[in-house]
Amino acid sequence: MMDSNRPNTYKAAVVQAASDPTSSLVSAQKAAALIEKAAGAGARLVVFPEAFIGGYPKGNSFGAPVGMRKPEGREAFRLYWEAAIDLDGVEVETIAAAAAATGAFTVIGCIEREQGTLYCTALFFDGARGLVGKHRKLMPTAGERLIWGFGDGSTMPVFETSLGNIGAVICWENYMPMLRMHMYSQGISIYCAPTADDRDTWLPTMQHIALEGRCFVLTACQHLKRGAFPADYECALGADPETVLMRGGSAIVNPLGKVLAGPCFEGETILYADIALDEVTRGKFDFDAAGHYSRPDVFQLVVDDRPKRAVSTVSAVRARN
């Protein structure tokens, strides 16, 4: 059902900035200030990069050549685990407060800690309701698999809001056709793509997804220099503090693949674009990947969205005489 309070057009923002990989609280405080800045410019939706809170450890091998785990790698993981966040912690409270104060719906990447396992997670904040959900990255890429766990099918939400149907797919998950199809089947119209991919090939990927899903795509990547990390941080890209580890490339794309803002590679910035939700419907006139262009008589996708737990406890109740 169409939301009668839905704005015809509103302003969205994509934040391209460096987080503090040594302090999640500092990163959260920076994010809160950027939410306030974007909202002050009129943005009702604000999207942040992958792993903005907790940090993306670009260039770190975690001391793990094949068949070996070095002591210094174990210590690097301990420090990374310390920088991750619990979802009932002060970092989440800080973002929730900024979203509440501004009314801006916010999507932000974090490193989520659950006991001994870390997850690359996207968090969703509604200004009125606080943290409303999360998406855990299903498939970490290459070396990420050493430090991050795998999300299951229970955290692939699309939220119906007055700003459109909002969801998130993280970095190279965007190359998983079946995941994209699942998002399209949920009617996603605001497709958020937090990422660490700053290559020239990323923008065409985002344009393809916008065209394929007939949705707005908002992709956010950090602009991060080596100097954000301590001098003794192990980095395959060297020790020069001015070396750019991630160069951004954030962008906003409309449902017909037109780039509305970005890409920007020059430094930290906030990109803005007007989101006209009627363009989603206009786009689906001739292509609806999960609807009239889907051919379910030939192809079908089965999605298991049940949570998968390593241990399930069944407790016996002793009968009373």
UniProtKB/Swiss-Prot annotation:
Active site, per annotation: E50 (proton acceptor), K137 (proton donor), C171 (nucleophile)
pH influence on activity: Optimum pH is 7.0-8-0.
Activity as a function of temperature: Optimum temperature is 45 degrees Celsius.
Protein name: Nitrilase blr3397
Pfam families referenced in this protein's UniProt entry, alphabetically: CN_hydrolase
Organism superkingdom: Bacteria
Keyword ATP-binding: no
Enzyme class: hydrolase
Gene3D superfamilies for this protein: Carbon-nitrogen hydrolase
Family from the record: Belongs to the carbon-nitrogen hydrolase superfamily. Nitrilase family.
Catalytic activity field: an aliphatic nitrile + 2 H2O = a carboxylate + NH4(+)
